[in-house]
Swiss-Prot record:
Residues 1-22 are annotated as: Disordered. One of its GO terms (cellular component) is cytosolic small ribosomal subunit. GO terms for molecular function: structural constituent of ribosome. This is Small ribosomal subunit protein eS1. Keywords: Cytoplasm, Ribonucleoprotein, Ribosomal protein.
Amino acid sequence: MAVGKNKRISKGKKGGKKKAADPFSKKDWYDIKAPSVFQVKNVGKTLVSRTQGTKIASEGLKHRVFEISLADLQGDEDNAFRKIRLRAEDVQGKNVLTNFYGMDFTTDKLRSLVRKWQTLIEAHVDVKTTDNYTLRMFCIGFTKRRSNQVKRTCYAQSSQIRQIRRKMREIMVNQATSCDLKELVRKFIPEMIGKEIEKATSSIYPLQNVFIRKVKILKSPKFDLGKLMEVHGDYSEDVGTKVESPADETVVEGTPEIVGA
């Protein structure tokens, strides 16, 4: 019986199957360092491809933006609703030095603030700090019932809303233009600006839950390493410590043993 070709039996491909290379074998881990304004300095790690030819690893890391919860940066769960954006500005050894790049609220926190029977008042303004950072700040606030009020609702009139909005802008400009970015971030963490707005507008209409809900950096000055090191404070101490080998230790070489002598 003649043996013909069985077309259903597929032939094996020449060369066999290529072994998949591990993508992580060509990558390195770098530590992310937060500015000294925050309690926790070492906030995480990031991955980048190793330097190959003209592709330098540190260049791939620069201007990378990391979003971190303020609860992790401060070690305080009460601040979990704030998200801080940090941008990589410089790479030193295996450390990525970052700077403040923005702030936002979590969606669930914003949704929990909006309720019935009250007026929501929002304002935003562009400001310039003393160290030439241009920011856009967004403020949010809600009206509340007066202490002796019987009526269920607490709606503000249009004229009162305009007055409150004007006051919000005024305070935001005064607070931001009188300090540098580092000092301004210090004001954001305990919500100092929101408390001041609440106090200043109490004569117009009492407010509650006043927050700087969002901050965007629109324009940054030219990169200055000296300024960045100031922002990171005592960081230089733990960059790398010199390890000296003890002078009195001498390496003793053993005599080679001859097998079968």
